[in-house]
Design a protein with these regions (language model features):
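Copper-binding active sites and cupredoxin-like electron-transfer domains
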Residues: 1-138
Length: 138
């Protein structure tokens, strides 16, 4: 995920998170311990063994949750490394105040969006103000 800020930068927010979604194609079965070889046949058949956030299974859930306080403004930079699947990016319990579609930070944002599509190789930026306590789960 590469960020090129517009001239003058972005307005300040209370919390920023960078999240990348990806797929892992292994020869071994799901959750097999140890070294895993890459499986090109599964890649070509679009059958990943894992979908990961920030390169890890279960990331951003229990071990490294995205924590915010009520009333904070949040910005999430979200990208999909793919190589095959798109993402219907949604934060449980939130409506995005602003969505910068396809990562365009110079175009007017979409407003009041619940879910935004991010294609493989694409990115978006979303902003919202939290209204209830809890962890942010994508």
């Amino acid at each position: 995920l590469i960020l090129v800020e517009p001239k003058g930068g972005l307005k300040p927010v209370d919390r920023e998170f960078y999240v990348m979604q990806g797929e892992i194609y292994t020869r071994g079965p799901v959750m097999q311990q140890g070294y895993q070889e890459f499986d090109v046949e599964k890649l070509l058949a679009e059958k990943p063994e894992y979908f990961v956030l920030n390169g890890a299974v279960g990331a951003l859930t229990n071990e490294y949750p995205m924590k915010v306080k009520v009333g904070e403004t949040v910005r999430i930079f979200f990208g999909v490394g793919g190589p095959n699947y798109t993402s219907s990016m949604h934060v449980i319990g939130e409506i995005f105040d602003r969505v910068y579609d396809q990562g365009s930070l110079t175009a007017a944002p979409l407003t009041d969006v619940q879910t935004t599509l991010v294609p493989a190789g694409g990115a978006t930026m979303v902003e919202f103000k939290t209204e209830v306590p809890g962890r942010l789960i994508i």
